[in-house]
């Protein structure tokens, strides 16, 4: 069983050929085997790993290979596809994985840096396997490599896959056309993130097949683990309106060829643009439109990103109840889609981290977002620049200026790789702050000018507004051309309202803490004070009714009250 990273009882029975009773007896008798009651899965204690490796080293190679392949087959049958991929790769056996029907939706969460070697190894053995009419997994591997930015290898694979499909006598003409449409979809994504060129690629699909592509599309969130469509597709300073127009023009055809993948992305992009320009009312309207569109196709990542902008708007206005409600919805939606839960949970963590950094509660940020190596090992390559913005803000808030300065070159390089403008603006702002705080005033002015130079042509104010308290003196000191004065005046104007909103939200949070209640307990208490039943509270907060009951007991104890009626005194 040691070849499994974790396993359930059924897998144990298959792998060992033992009956349930004997498996349980053995599992329960070994202290170094851990059991997770929530997932009902077993795993070996890390202390046991060294011993296990020694045992395996002393066994005949053929026997170890046989055990590993049996475990791979078990994982494949049980739908644990990435676990199967790892074991097949380790055993140098690739036929079954290439010929199996696997959904990309089950593979996408594992397309992260720490797993790159597995994907690359399997891709390198494409040429060794007879496909026998099965090319789904080959295309999945192709798109996965594209997400590792391995464009050269992807182009080589696509050329040979195209040739093999054309020569495959097993396939009907209709099936060949279907595969060709899928190949064209991947080719379009080789032009990421130039949506103009991507659009040209998508339009070719309409002439190849009348059916929607379905092997890749729908298997990954349109916005990956990034809550900002604008971050992904704004790539040229001064061209934001043109880029937005291109997305809006392409959306109907993209939805047609993908059966609604990313539905609502063009409304969300415009909402993002308007928010960054300080047009909160316009952004709010378009967020509601994006939510409606995304909900019609279960596009949860778009849904979450829309609520993220709404949470930012509520923060600006100082509307604490709306702010908390939008944040709760982000968390609830992330739990809704269980098959994609890993990527959606990451997206939720990233949204929360952004909001916590805005109200200077950086200690509440998820642990993995505070660790640069874990970020690089956990986040899709296309989303990495956005998470680096959050990590950079975390370092600035904690006054780790030298740490940020040390990694800034790497961050700028990654931003340039995809021509990401928004992360570049934030990085320059953080560089200005870090240099100012370390006594390098001339450099600070230089980097602030660079940030303004990128942002001013498209009227992107919010990165400066979010950091205004740290850069206000620099902005006043920096010598900027006459053309930029209007831009700076708008930043100052928007910042006044933003700082009031942040103070209001922070004050509300402190008031709850003064009662001795956690945020969750305060939410429950407030609804209870309004005479909502436990069931109604559970539905509104997306928690179990039993959780509400246990919270109410704690609330009564902390506030030293005996009835719900007394709660009104605390929330008037």
Regions found by a protein language model. Name each.
Residues 503-553, 557-572:
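Helix-turn-helix DNA-binding segment
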Residues 78, 107-121, 150-167, 193-210, ...:
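Helix-turn-helix repeat elements of alpha-solenoid scaffolds
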Residues 80-82, 94-98, 134-135, 171-181, ...:
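Alpha-solenoid helical repeat architecture
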Residues 85, 105-106, 123-127, 159-172, ...:
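Amphipathic alpha-helical segments of tetratricopeptide repeats
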Residues 54-137, 141-144, 153:
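Extended alpha-helical scaffolding segments used for macromolecular assembly and cargo binding
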Residues 390-397, 402-421, 430-433, 437-519, ...:
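Linker/hinge segments immediately adjacent to helix-turn-helix/homeobox DNA-binding domains
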Residues 1-57, 66-69:
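C-terminal boundary/linker of central alpha/beta nucleotide-binding cores
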Residues 129-305:
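Internal alpha-solenoid helical repeat scaffolds
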